Regions:
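A glycine- and small-residue-enriched flexible loop/hinge signal that marks low-structured segments
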Residues: 2-22, 32-47, 53, 66-67, ...
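Hydrophobic alpha-helical segments
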Residues: 384-391, 420-424
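Soluble or luminal CAZymes and related metallo-dependent hydrolases
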Residues: 72
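Cofactor-binding catalytic cores of oxidoreductases
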Residues: 57
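C-terminal edge-of-domain segments
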Residues: 403-435
Length: 435
């Protein structure tokens, strides 16, 4: 066996032997990032305080009762059902948790105290039943109900053996006493204040999401969400979209203003987040549960488009999206009407977000900034744009449209590119010659 061996940086080894390096053949590493994530502050009767919880569509359908205190089909879950019509994932924040009170109850004379896991009025729907166990006369069945649904049963001999469940915590010592049912009481919701919304935005800024939504009518809070969106997009480079109701004053490509009912922002947020970069929401059928006010005249719909309003119209028995637009209306030569199209913005945002992610994951601090390194990065970008070309999100692309140059400092890389996003057909102008 040779004395020398291993890998090498330069051929300067002393001992005879084989020194072998294995390297990957150069290939693109990046791909399009995930869409479909909605950040949602919501007033709820149950749930953790001051915390962002992540729920996917499957969890929502199967575990809504355990997580949110209501079953999937309950009326209180309608906003989330609307969001999940399009979203894959929701970053949920209970906006009225702070300042609430937990429901409590005491069972028997030995001091079994039950406290709801979370503050809120839903805790008042919890009931505890203690009954004799039919198989062991020394033990009891302690049953937790929420509404009429049995959610937990524990068979124990003493209070100390009881474990917390998804809805209540048990405290006390000694023997249990049989009771047909003791309801918890005193649960109260907190209030949703401007401070609560600021706290939510502070926390959600650290999360990855596609679309932010606020369903309220408070103008100060709308302005807060508008400013947050503009700061993230323009100062931080995080290309999110925010959906509000009746807020065309934003005049910004990152803010969508819904014209019809305020509660439709939930559906719009889910659809906007879940739409692929090669999809438009124009003429999409509304498949949600709310009654939609579409009683507008033709000229009002025309004005809505000019104002930058996202509107719904009646098409026979269906309700559909009039035009997939945002609030940007202050067109200029360097920023024209294309920027008012949400499909175009989805493409541009995807390019910006994915380019930043690819550079950070695979090139930042890892690849030398010389001609070879910059050529690798260019090839990466070319491959990425070809993915967009293949799904018809962009058109007329060739590799000469991307130029990668050294910057002023040795660490700087400059990229100049030309891109042509596509959009969906919306207007048909047809001339027919009749002979």
């Amino acid at each position: 066996m040779a004395l020398g061996g291993g890998t090498f940086t330069v051929p300067n080894k002393v001992l005879p032997g084989a020194y072998i390096n294995f390297v990957s053949m150069a290939r693109a590493l990046g791909s399009m990032g995930e869409r479909g994530i909605v950040a949602l502050p919501l007033e709820m009767n149950w749930g953790p305080e001051d915390e962002v919880i992540t729920i996917d569509a499957g969890e929502f359908q199967k575990e809504a009762l355990n997580i949110l205190g209501y079953s999937f089909a309950d009326e209180e879950m309608k906003p989330l059902r609307e969001v999940f019509k399009g979203a894959k994932l929701v970053k949920l924040y209970r906006i009225n948790g702070a300042g609430g009170k937990k429901a409590t109850a005491t069972v028997g004379t030995e001091g079994l105290t039950i406290t709801a896991k979370h503050p809120g009025t839903r805790g008042n729907d919890i009931k505890i039943v203690v009954q004799a166990n039919i198989d062991d006369e020394t033990k009891f069945d302690v049953i937790t109900y929420i509404g009429t649904t049995k959610v937990d049963t524990q068979t124990v001999a003493t209070i100390a053996e009881l474990e917390p469940n998804n809805f209540v915590e048990f405290n006390g010592t000694g023997a249990l006493e049989i009771t047909a049912g003791v309801p918890l009481a005193g649960g109260e919701n907190g209030t949703s204040t401007g401070e609560n919304y600021s706290s939510f935005l502070d926390k959600i800024e650290a999360e990855d999401f596609t679309t932010l939504v606020y369903a309220g009518e408070d103008e100060v809070t709308k302005a807060l969400f508008d400013s947050f969106t503009k700061r993230l997009r323009d100062d931080e480079g995080v290309k999110i979209t925010t959906v509000l109701h009746d807020y065309v004053k934003a005049d910004f490509e990152g803010v969508i203003s819904v014209k019809n009912n305020p509660e439709l922002v939930y559906w719009v947020a889910g659809q906007s987040a879940g739409a692929n970069v090669n999809e438009s929401l124009t003429n999409r059928k509304y498949d949600g549960e709310y009654e939609v006010n579409t009683k507008f005249k033709k000229r009002e719909f025309e004005q809505a488009i000019q104002n930058g309003e996202f509107a719904f119209y009646q098409d026979g028995n269906d309700v559909r999206v009039l035009k997939d637009i945002n609030t940007f209306t202050n067109f200029a030569p360097e920023k024209n009407q294309d920027f008012s199209s949400n499909r175009v913005i989805r493409v541009l945002d995807q390019i910006a977000n994915d380019t930043a992610r690819i550079f950070s994951d695979y090139y930042l601090g890892k690849v030398t900034n010389d001609d070879t390194g910059r050529e690798l990065f260019k090839n990466e970008l070319v491959n990425y744009h070809e993915q967009l070309l293949n799904i018809r999100a962009i058109e007329n692309f060739n590799q000469e449209d991307i130029i990668v140059l050294p910057g002023v400092q040795k660490q700087d890389v400059i990229v100049n590119e030309v891109v042509q996003p596509t959009d969906s057909m919306e207007k048909l102008y047809m001339s027919i010659e009749v002979r």
